[in-house]
Amino acid sequence: MKNIPVVLMGCGGVGRQLLQHIVTCRSLHANQGIRLRVVGVCDSKSLVAAPDVYSMELSDNLLLEVCRVKLDSSSSLLTLNGECQVYSNSELTKKIIDIAALLGLALVDCSASSETIGVLNRVVDIGCCAVLANKKPLTSKMEDYDKLVSHPRFIRHESTVGAGLPVIASLNRLLSSGDPVHRIIGSLSGTLGYVMSEVEDGKPFSQVVKSAKSLGYTEPDPRDDLSGMDVARKALILARLLGQRLNLDSIKIESLYPEEMRPGVMSAEEFLGSGVSLLDKDIQERVHKASLNGNVLRYVCVIEGSRCEVGIQELPKDSALGRLKGSDNVLEIYSRCYFEQPLVIQGAGAGNDTTATGVLADILDLQDLFP
């Protein structure tokens, strides 16, 4: 039986779903000759670890208890009952590195923190593996990024772009086979994909944003989605894969709300109550203009040469992006082999379940690196 020791950072929606997947897939993995030994789980305040990480692991019952406790985001892992050791925030990073040095583990980052880059780099540097759903380490400054990806065999981050869709794997296959990618255009936000396809049908922008929030498609403050920053991070990850030496502030980002409506100036309640409706006319006019040209509006990332930008683009109705409905992600990749007809990747590109499934697949993809 091949044993893969795992430490999980981040107990939010994706992290909890991953733990549930690991538990429910025990018999499947056993049939494949694999055992995922979860030896530690941490949130921003504490680390829960097996008493003896070399010979023990956190029980499935304890992992499910973690999921239950962390359903309330304000709850701490310190309240857990079970056979485990608990380490405080000040000990957290050192303990993870100690466990990594002892076991040669897979460190899984399902947090949304920009603070994990240090421990990820240390762990990879000592020959361990890292699996990321967290985009922030991969969109940090180039110096930190270069360190993180300096051992590409040890890194997997499929779920950072397109959740469980095979975006990163497809790009890597093209690039490693000598098929240069010269253009990528994609709708990489389920929220903004939904918004743009709904306003195309004549619905007011404000109504669509509120509907998206009620359906759970947006963050608690929809401006976190409407700013385009999440799409920009995904675009930067793809651009860097293609070899571009870019930072986040190099990307041209079109926000769907003006500066005077940004957080800190206007509250989320004010934005939803009165601010967002002031944007209806402009969006409606842009939709109408595109329609006259036989086109539709989509919020996309475009990567071509040294160009990397995100924003609203007019696109043909009969293209893969033009036909997009709902919250799916669509990515068109143009290369030497896919010159006239692009490689199109489409499917659910958001959701805790889909993202966690992608993370689990990444962990299993590293199995040949473990004894």
Question: Where are the model-predicted features located?
Answer:
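NAD(P)-dependent dehydrogenase/reductase Rossmann-like domain
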Residues: M1-L8, G12-R26, Q32, R37-G40, ...
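Hydrophobic residues within beta-strands of alpha/beta enzymes
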Residues: A130-V131, I184
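A generic secondary-structure micro-motif detector
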Residues: D109-C110, N134-K135, D225, V276
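Glycine-enriched alpha-helix->loop->beta-strand junction motifs that scaffold or abut catalytic
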Residues: I126-A130, G190
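Rossmann-fold NAD(P)-binding glycine/threonine-rich loop
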Residues: S113-I126, K135-L174
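N-terminal glycine-/serine-/threonine-rich beta1-alpha1-beta2 phosphate-ribose binding loop
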Residues: M1-D125
